[in-house]
Amino acid sequence: RKEYVLHHDNETYYGHVSRNGIYISWDHFARGYHDYTDGVNVGLHEMAHAISYDVFLGYQDRHDRGFKRRLQEFRVEGGPVFRAMKEGDPHLLDSYAATNFDEFWAVCVETFFETPESLRDEEPGLYATICELLNQDPTRQDKIIDKRMAGIRY
């Protein structure tokens, strides 16, 4: 239920993704939904890892090429922000985002859903790229951007 230690590296985890599944400390998962605005949500964080893991390491033939392209666009748009954080620049994103680019992506997803207005205001290009990538804008009343892409019929 609480954080756990993996035998291969003796590190403490709240969640992780592997080819065998998504593993999450239930206590930390539940905490993520007690405060929707603190920017911390292990469930969202690990789902972001699962998305990138599956797109880049999973079965390539089952993925929408457009989605992979949009994920690459995120890498281009997010690169300068990530590099600035690595150099120690203060940022809205949790400092854990500077660990590596995979963590940067996962922290961006947490922030996108937990404090979308702040991310939109501080990093409008990054925010717009994530909106397009995930086909939603949490700041809008009608959150889905392209209903056809989401499979919604009129």
Q: Model segments located where?
A:
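Metalloprotease/metallohydrolase-associated module, dominated by Zn2+-dependent proteases
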Residues: 2-37, 54-154
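Short alpha-helix carrying the canonical HExxH Zn2+-binding catalytic motif
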Residues: 35-52
